[in-house]
Amino acid sequence: MKKLCAIFGGNFDPIHYGHINLAEKLAKDISIKKIILLPNNYPPHRNKTQTSISDKIKMIKLAIHNNPLFEISYLETKKNNIFYTIDTLKKIRKKISHLEPLCFIIGEDNLQTFYLWKNWREILLYSHLLIYPRKHKKQKNDELEKWIHSNTVYDCNLLHKQPCGLIFFSHAPCINISSSRIRKNYFYGKNSHSLLPSIVNNYILLKKLYYTNQ
């Protein structure tokens, strides 16, 4: 059985234990051999923050140092460009064999508005979707719900047996840490050292990140 590679995209502003612990839990439960962290410089469905992409990347590198599970992709880091998942997956598939199983990790909150993503139905042509629990407001979209229902599987081993095309809902613990909360903590002078690796905390303090309201 082939082991999975997985892509975990996000703002990572900053990367924190919620990201890291979730990724390690998914890797253990579903036998993921490699998780590719995909920092977004300018995600289309979120407000842009003031943190530079170079600072985000540096914090990620510090957080995953000497952890062989992780690597970083720079495909969505070009300044002032808007990136779409479907385009990024096409580029990744040019580097990874179309026969190799690949997952794209997203939260249940993002799944609710998945129908707004560019060419959203085509994403399963390039990867599986691996969904992790996240608090969200239910948004009803009949077309999306039908699509999810028709492609969802309940045995994670099936993700290893074909390269793409399936949706799997993980039972990983819900993330109760948010990057926006951490940014606010720093802005108001509150301690966040328990929410992210100490080396990342030290970098934030050294560079005085998040000292202005974002």
Curated annotation (Swiss-Prot):
Gene3D superfamilies: HUPs. It comes from the Bacteria. Its EC number is 2.7.7.18. GO terms for molecular function: ATP binding; nicotinate-nucleotide adenylyltransferase activity. GO terms for biological process: NAD biosynthetic process. InterPro entries: Cyt_trans-like, NadD/NMNAT, Rossmann-like_a/b/a_fold. Signal peptide: none annotated. Keywords: ATP-binding, NAD, Nucleotide-binding, Nucleotidyltransferase, Pyridine nucleotide biosynthesis, Transferase. Disulfide bonds: none annotated. Pathway: Cofactor biosynthesis; NAD(+) biosynthesis; deamido-NAD(+) from nicotinate D-ribonucleotide: step 1/1. Coiled coil: none annotated. CDD domains: NMNAT. It catalyses: nicotinate beta-D-ribonucleotide + ATP + H(+) = deamido-NAD(+) + diphosphate. It is an enzyme of class 2 (transferase). Pfam families: CTP_transf_like (PF01467). NCBIfam families: cyt_tran_rel (TIGR00125), nicotinate (nicotinamide) nucleotide adenylyltransferase (TIGR00482), PRK00071.1-1 (NF000839). Belongs to the NadD family. Catalyzes the reversible adenylation of nicotinate mononucleotide (NaMN) to nicotinic acid adenine dinucleotide (NaAD). This is Probable nicotinate-nucleotide adenylyltransferase. It comes from Buchnera aphidicola subsp. Acyrthosiphon pisum (strain APS). The gene is nadD.
